[in-house]
Amino acid sequence: MFQHTTVLLKEAVDGLHIKPDGIYVDCTLGGGGHSEYLLSQLSEDGRLFAFDQDDMAIEYAKKRLARYEKQVTFIRRNFRFLAEELTARGVHRVDGILFDLGVSSPQLDTPERGFSYHHDAPLDMRMNREQSLTAYDIVNHWPYEELVHIFFHYGEEKFSKQVARKIEEVRKEKRIETTGQLVDIIKEAIPAPARRSGGHPAKRIFQAIRIAVNDELQAFKEAITQAIDLLKSGGRISVITFHSLEDRICKVAFKEASQGPQLPPGLPLIPDQYRPALKIITKKPIVPSEEEIEHNHRARSAKLRIAEKL
């Protein structure tokens, strides 16, 4: 069962100012929580396009959202193909777009998917199970320098070199096949005082490998640019992030689109192509309430940013 507690449900969807007959996109369908709440506010003329590259998520959501089948279109593809997929369906402008980034609870809680450092499972971590690159390939075949790069930049791990060196040592002797083996290697590589603070010692390394396997940051950069372009005037975009790397991409994209390019001073009229594209609605990101965090500890690091197309 693809059970998943939706984070910042009302805040993210209500922030889109839903029009009953509008066209909306949920770029991260997951368990279907945001989509269900959004669909409940649409009339028969409203439309929702829901993206997910995980076949498990699509199958579950089709059942959950069966009563809205005339209003929802499921698209099993990475959201980096947002514009391409909508254009293919004759959609060139939309009223609202939602991103809820990060791994869904069912992916984390299904041991054989290999996302979690709490279960021993094959090193996989693919959100799209048809792609070839897995966590096993990265851990066993990527060179030391590449491992250091992803651990430091995607995991913000200060012991990146030590972990990469330990992986290199171990894989010379035997293949590293499971998440459990990798956790043991990470624990050996990180100094004892550091292991005792700051959460699970494998958290940052697992995040880094997952981001690399799924090319998450580049995919999001491409998708958010397309999303801003696709919005109608007055349309809104809600983005929920779970770590600083994603949040930075969102913050920069919103800031750049809300400022417009630098212009020479003294222009009597600003040409349309130089006007800002967005107005930022959330000066500071919206974060979950203490009550929400108490009910769903995975919501703790969530941040919601909203912007409106001018």
From Swiss-Prot:
The keyword Metal-binding does not apply. S-adenosyl-L-methionine binds at residues 32-34, 52, 83, 100, 107. The keyword Hydrolase does not apply. Coiled coil: none annotated. One of its GO terms (cellular component) is cytoplasm. Pfam families: Methyltransf_5. GO terms for biological process: rRNA base methylation. Its main location: cytoplasm. GO terms for molecular function: rRNA (cytosine-N4-)-methyltransferase activity. It catalyses: cytidine(1402) in 16S rRNA + S-adenosyl-L-methionine = N(4)-methylcytidine(1402) in 16S rRNA + S-adenosyl-L-homocysteine + H(+). InterPro entries: RsmH, SAM-dep_MeTrfase_MraW_recog, SAM-dependent_MTases_sf. Keywords: Cytoplasm, Methyltransferase, rRNA processing, S-adenosyl-L-methionine, Transferase. It is found in: Cytoplasm. Its EC number is 2.1.1.199. Belongs to the methyltransferase superfamily. RsmH family. Specifically methylates the N4 position of cytidine in position 1402 (C1402) of 16S rRNA. This is Ribosomal RNA small subunit methyltransferase H. It comes from Geobacillus sp. (strain WCH70). The gene is rsmH.
